[in-house]
A protein has these predicted regions:
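Central hydrophobic cores of alpha-helical transmembrane segments
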Residues: 21-25, 319-332, 350-351
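Short helix-to-coil transition segments within interhelical loops
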Residues: 224-230
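Residues that define the loop-to-transmembrane-helix transition and helix capping
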Residues: 18, 231, 318-320
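Short hydrophobic, aromatic-rich alpha-helical segments embedded in or entering the lipid bilayer
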Residues: 343-364
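N-terminal Sec/SRP start-transfer signal
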Residues: 1-23
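Junction motif at the cytosolic side of a transmembrane helix
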Residues: 5-7, 11, 310-314, 381-403
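Hydrophobic transmembrane alpha-helix segments characteristic of membrane transport
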Residues: 217-221
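Secretory targeting signals
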Residues: 26-83, 133-214, 235-314, 318, ...
């Protein structure tokens, strides 16, 4: 334990570590959460002098939007949808531009395009919600089921795979609860989902020198070696890297959740994620989806940390270690679109390469003849990869230093 605390203090004393943590916090929490909620994400859009075309009034807009959505009764039925569309069209006809910003028009418009494509008027420049006849918006859940079936068939997911996905989807409660959706869509679709990509950069910078940096200055390590041995030092470094990973995640996640609670509160936590993407099959509400996404990031970050520390233990050069570490995450992202679909799915199992937004998709893996929904593997395989790398990091470091 003494070795761990020494290594932990040693890591946090580095100026580069403090700078990385500060930059990561500013980028993700200040810009990616607080200012996004208050300004350029949800601020009212009538101030054209602003760099983002938004007023600095996101808190008020969010609260007004939540209150407006609650006026529709809490359940999403044909009548609810008709009322939402009719109300929007009436406000638009009355020129109530400010009031329109309180509506979930982007979400509702995506529902209309998905479920009622025959009502789309290609000659009309307006969005569907502006001109579609509300009385024709019937059979919401029947149409959703039909669209889901058609999507699975077009995707080649038929037979046993289709049945497997239907079994998962069958657990989704209907009718859906309805409150303000746009905030949760932004939160789950980008804010939490992007955390892993952001952490990968700063974890790579900090942890790449954890082992490799000792080749530039061995003094403190040599002193410790006389009493403890390289193996124990390597283990202390591994634990330090894991502790830093968890600490960085906790700092970002807790700060982001506090920001979320301040701006959005808990309203809408029990809505199904199908409100964001109708053909999603996951039987999750918004809160469960958020917990999954944060767990995905934490476990993926631990897995990535294990890989970075293994590379750092095996390579003497700090810069090369950093480049190789970043290539583990960003390399597959850059080449994925040029690869066959099955290979793309395989690359998603690399820590922080896949996306937590797979909970909105119907991707599956077939392992030893058994179908497994992709989110199950995306949250387990990456951390196992990192854990498997850690003993090799210890052995590699000990072997190199003894040589």
């Amino acid at each position: 334990m003494e070795l761990f605390w020494l290594e932990h203090k040693k890591l946090w004393r580095k100026k580069i570590v403090k700078i990385c943590v500060l930059l990561c916090f500013v980028y993700y929490v200040i810009f990616g959460s607080i200012l996004l909620f208050q300004w350029f994400g949800f601020g009212s859009s009538d101030d054209y002098t602003s760099a983002f075309g938004n007023n600095f009034d996101g808190y008020t807009v969010i609260k007004d939007s939540q209150g407006y959505a609650l006026s529709f009764g809490g359940e999403l039925t044909d009548e609810t949808l008709q009322q939402i569309v009719s109300d929007y069209q009436q406000m638009e006809a009355d020129g109530m531009e400010e009031e329109l910003e309180k509506t979930d028009w982007q979400i509702v418009n995506s529902w209309l395009g998905t479920l009622y494509p025959e009502l789309r008027d290609t000659s009309n420049y307006k969005t569907m919600i502006s001109y579609v006849d509300p009385d024709k918006l019937t059979g919401f859940y029947e149409r959703r089921q039909q669209v889901l079936d058609e999507f699975l068939e077009v995707s080649g997911q038929v037979g046993a795979e289709k049945e497997y996905l239907h079994q998962i989807e069958g657990k989704v409660e209907k009718p859906f609860r309805y409150e303000w959706v746009e905030g949760w869509s932004t939160l789950l679709g980008s804010m939490v989902a992007d955390l892993g990509v952001v952490m990968a950069l700063f974890l790579g910078i900090v942890l790449s020198s954890l082992f490799a940096g000792e080749w530039h200055d061995n003094t403190s390590t040599l002193v410790l070696t006389t009493r403890n041995g390289w193996g124990k030092i390597a283990l202390a470094k591994i634990l330090t890297g894991l502790a830093f990973t968890v600490e960085l995640f906790a700092l970002l996640a807790v700060s982001s959740v506090i920001s979320q609670l301040f701006f959005m509160g808990t309203a809408g936590w029990d809505m199904p994620i199908q409100n964001i993407k109708l053909i999603a099959v996951a039987p999750m509400n918004m809160l469960q989806a958020e917990i999954y996404e944060y767990a995905f990031v934490l476990l993926g970050a631990i897995g990535f940390a294990g890989i970075v520390m293994f590379i750092s233990a095996a390579v003497k050069n700090n810069v090369l270690t950093l480049l190789l570490s970043l290539a583990v995450v960003y390399g597959p992202m850059m080449i994925a679109e040029y690869l066959p679909y099955e290979m793309q799915k395989a690359l998603d199992l690399i820590p922080l390469v896949g996306s937590s937004t797979d909970i909105f998709r119907t991707n599956t893996f077939r392992i030893f003849g058994k179908l497994i929904w992709s989110p199950y593997l995306l949250i387990t395989i990456p951390v196992l990869i990192g854990i498997l790398c850690m003993p090799f990091a210890i052995k590699s470091w000990s072997r190199r230093m003894k040589a």
